Amino acid sequence: MPSVRVAQVSPPWLAVPPKGYGGIEWVVALLADGLTESGHDVTLFATGDSTTKAKLEYVFAEAPGPAAINDIWHDSVQTMYALRNPDDFDVFHLHSPFSALAAGAVLGRPAVHTLHGSFNPHMRLLYEQVKDRAWFVAISQAQRDHMPELNYAGVVYNGIDVPAYPFRKEKDDYVLFLGRAAPEKGALRAVLAAQAAGVRLVAAVKVADPLEKEHWEQEVLPNMPKDATVLGEVTIEEKMDLLSRARAVLFPIDWEEPFGLVMTEAMACGTPVIATPRGSVPEVVADGRTGFVVSVESYPEEAAAALKRVGEIDPAACRAWVEEKFSKEAMVAGYERAYELAVSG
């Protein structure tokens, strides 16, 4: 498409890209860089400690950090700063679920909003108020199906920088669970599947709040096999190493997760994914080709059987699948189509 002037308005709580955990910020970082590389005039509104190939503007010199996440004051200040000169841009791309969306609806300029989260009652009420005045992008068809009445500019999968992920054909003798300790993320299911299959588990887990801590300490750890390796939150480099060496990644979620980046990250490393069919899983994992989608009803037996079959999965097929569907380039092309629709519509 012809070059457009794009304002990328990131959430204000973490740097872009983030220093650690922060899926939205990773996506924004890749998108801002990818659009710039494609010849678009991109301005990223984020915190001053962000790094980007786009032009960077900020109010807050440093990200306030995870403790401030969902704090509306930071969000409102950054949003109003980004919107102060609307004529400078052809399209605003908003990534925060709060004030950015509401402000974008009264800009008089095309506003695209990516639905990074789930549709809880508060978000549903907000989206209902502006559903005809902003363009929405879902990050999976499963997410879109939960609120089909919105004004969609399309479905665009979250992309990753595939060449940055180490591809490894030969694997070590462990399976990996990587994620938060929240019950819906499925750490306990991962433990049970590894036990049933008789394989060693490595669990790299972030404990984010008291409820997660309670679940982790009272439900998961007492069932953890003695030969398991239990890690806390890992660095980006450690994550990539763990993903590339694992025989498989377990993703046994128990909620309608709109998109799970760890699945694409694992497959980019040539590592198959074994997951339950919730949220975007059936769209992301090619069952029998890049991993196995196993039923909740027959868990953990079916997951254990799948773990014994991971040798049937070609690591090169996993990598090729991600390059085709979930690369940075595929994501940029998807958003270019969304912007074209928003600007022309």
List where the protein language model places each region.
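Catalytic cores of nucleotide-sugar-dependent glycosyltransferases that transfer UDP/GDP/TDP-activated
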Residues: M1-G345
